[in-house]
């Protein structure tokens, strides 16, 4: 199996979030639990719209964020300052998957780069450093935003329909990621 996100079933831990069971990588759950035991607040970073990502995959990421919020606020009064600090301390922001030159993702979405940005490649597979490539690199200024193609249309490298992707991104940007779980 290539690096495609496959995880052996015994490498998963089931946790209930908003009344539904989700399977999370045991290493991630254990890391969060060990951080609390050590008095450290770890920070997970999230990326959405990777090639192959579906809405169900994104829901699992969102559920893990919500599980962390519940974990860090367990036993605290929602009105308390400590609850608010712990809840806000869980990173609920997400980057949008971005194909940077030289990365594995760049190679995976090469045909999309040609279609969306008119990027050309030489016979060795390297991008031709012309105006199209330069404009693409300028578009990479902020990985939290949605890339727009040469026509100004949004680009989604994942498997979600564009309308779904844009709605999810809207929920992330508005700080209402829990709404993704309801989609």
Can you name each region flagged by the protein language model?
Residues 1-183:
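A structural motif corresponding to the C-terminal lobe/cap of the Radical SAM core domain
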């Amino acid at each position: 199996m290539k690096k495609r996100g496959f995880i052996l079933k015994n490498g998963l831990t089931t946790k209930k979030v908003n009344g539904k069971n989700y399977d999370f990588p045991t290493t991630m759950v254990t890391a969060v639990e060990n951080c609390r035991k050590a008095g450290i607040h770890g920070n997970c970073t999230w990326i959405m719209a990777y090639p192959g990502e579906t809405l169900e995959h994104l829901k699992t990421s969102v559920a893990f964020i919500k599980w962390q919020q519940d974990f860090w606020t367990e036993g605290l009064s929602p009105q308390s300052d400590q609850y608010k600090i712990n809840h806000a301390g869980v990173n609920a922001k997400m980057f949008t998957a971005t194909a940077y030159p030289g990365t594995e993702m760049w190679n995976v979405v090469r045909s999309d780069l040609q279609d969306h940005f008119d990027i050309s490649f030489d016979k060795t597979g390297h991008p031709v450093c012309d105006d199209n490539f330069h404009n693409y690199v300028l578009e990479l200024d902020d990985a939290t935003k949605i890339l727009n193609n040469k026509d100004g249309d949004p680009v989604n490298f994942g498997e979600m329909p564009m309308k779904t992707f844009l709605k999810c991104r809207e929920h992330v940007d508005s700080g209402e990621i829990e709404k993704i779980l309801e989609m």
